[in-house]
């Protein structure tokens, strides 16, 4: 099993909170669309003193499944339409568990 963790810091915008909730909702639907994605947890930071706005924790069975998930059209649509416009500054780590 591979664990994929991403932390996002987004630029400020008038509708940032609504956009973060939309990103969370859409990411949480991906296991129903991408069979290789076994589980996903998305959290919105509630502590304004912290740097990161959103965290993602995803689980796939094999390393190649991580590529399948990352390149899947449903995932890419979220990245292109929701994450990229907010100019995300991500930090990522992947490891076998």
List the model feature ranges, each with a label.
Residues 1-53, 61-71, 94-97:
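Short S/T/G/P-rich N-terminal loop/turn motif that feeds into the first structured element of a domain
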